[in-house]
Amino acid sequence: MLIHPEINPVALQLGPLAIHWYGLTYLAAFGLFFFLASLRLRHEPYASITGPGAWSRRDIEDILFLGVMGVVIGGRLGYCLFYKPGYYLTHPLEIFAVWQGGMSFHGGMLGVLVSQWWFARSRQRPWLQVMDFIAPCVPTGLAAGRVGNFINGELWGRFSAPDLPWGMVFAHSGSMLPRHPSQVYQFLMEGLLLFVLLWLYARKPRKMGQVSGAFLVGYGVFRFIAEFFREPDDFLGILALGMSMGQWLCVPMIAAGIWLWIWASNRTSRR
């Protein structure tokens, strides 16, 4: 049995300014995205895509800027709407209290979809071409976010078997019984494993929409599995059919990914 180290969430204190580890993981996520997107720009199929114009470093900068806006706004609104709609309907001003925590991946994903639709429209590019470009660069950012969750000792897992070698006690959970370190599970599955699989899959020319479909299915499946080990939000608990809110949100995501991949596979054009 392991004990969570209870790391100070503040990485650096500069007078009244507190720099949190969680904020640094967000910076790491955006930095990794820019690095990986730059690598993608040098390789097929994007190195040879010229219509309606060659891809450039400026494109990546704009994609990242709009993506950050989509993640923050969509993630916050998604949390408020998916997890605590009743509370935020009666306390609407607290939607802006982002320092209190509360972000949703599924909401952030919707925010990114909208922001990249705007980018694609402004560049007169196919929206799916843009999404296929960025999809393999996303999992490392998810991995960085799970590192932040672990450092904060939040989003811990359900109770594990007492003899599980990596079972971990999280002091903030209110119990001294070992739990699954679900943040680590998600780091490995939604972060590293999904990144490797998607990066390798996307290195070969694919029909437009296939990479995006593969991402939706891959993330949805890994998140669905991880939810069996993650402690449900105490204000929601387990919902219909014994599934958590995270799992219910993954169901349409997986279905959409399967549909998109099949639809893209039946297309005659790769772009």
Swiss-Prot record:
One Pfam family linked to the record: LGT
Protein name per UniProt: Phosphatidylglycerol--prolipoprotein diacylglyceryl transferase
GO molecular function: phosphatidylglycerol-prolipoprotein diacylglyceryl transferase activity
Classification via InterPro entries: Lgt
Subcellular location, record wording: Cell inner membrane
Residues binding a 1,2-diacyl-sn-glycero-3-phospho-(1'-sn-glycerol), per UniProt: 146
Known EC number: 2.5.1.145
Keywords: Cell inner membrane, Cell membrane, Membrane, Transferase, Transmembrane, Transmembrane helix
Disulfide bonds: none
Species of provenance: Polaromonas naphthalenivorans (strain CJ2)
Main localization, broad class: membrane
Membrane topology annotation: Multi-pass membrane protein
Known function: Catalyzes the transfer of the diacylglyceryl group from phosphatidylglycerol to the sulfhydryl group of the N-terminal cysteine of a prolipoprotein, the first step in the formation of mature lipoproteins.
Pathway: Protein modification; lipoprotein biosynthesis (diacylglyceryl transfer)
GO annotation terms (biological process): lipoprotein biosynthetic process
Keyword Protein biosynthesis: no
